[in-house]
């Protein structure tokens, strides 16, 4: 199956949603699903579904629908969900602590396997209820050198985000999910995704106001 590596970012962001839908369809015993069924489940139009799928070659035949189990396995493969992906978290403030308690592995094969904060943080040297060890930020290199971790979740204050991101890159991290509302200047081969809760809430309020 041929995959177009130049897919739009909007399409890429929907991949995990498609995967989730096909897993749900499979659990419900649905063997075939039309583009309309998929679109309705996601709240988008069927043309968007067909356009998204066109980037991945022949995923289904017109008039026959999409094979649910086949597509579930396809998206699991491109999202690397056949094997466990270990990630690290840096920043054990309010957001960081909430994420430490979030059970990623209950839904997907991702797990936070270690966390870091300032060496002076009370959590350093301890293990969370879910068995995640918390280390001092000065030991990042020591703990990553023999690990398979290439992804980090960054939940530090915006004033520290760039400095910490630089440390992560030097330690071998290839991808960062940043909750800090600042743009990070990093090498081009480092992938960064931003989660700005304030911006998302403001966007929601804007659309709500437009409906009044």
UniProtKB/Swiss-Prot annotation:
Claim: Flavoprotein is one of the keywords in the record: no
GO CC annotations, alphabetized: cytoplasm
Keywords assigned: Cytoplasm, DNA-binding, NAD, Repressor, Transcription, Transcription regulation
Positions bound to NAD(+): 91-96
Protein name as it appears in the record: Redox-sensing transcriptional repressor Rex
Assembly notes: Homodimer.
Compartments, as annotated in UniProt: Cytoplasm
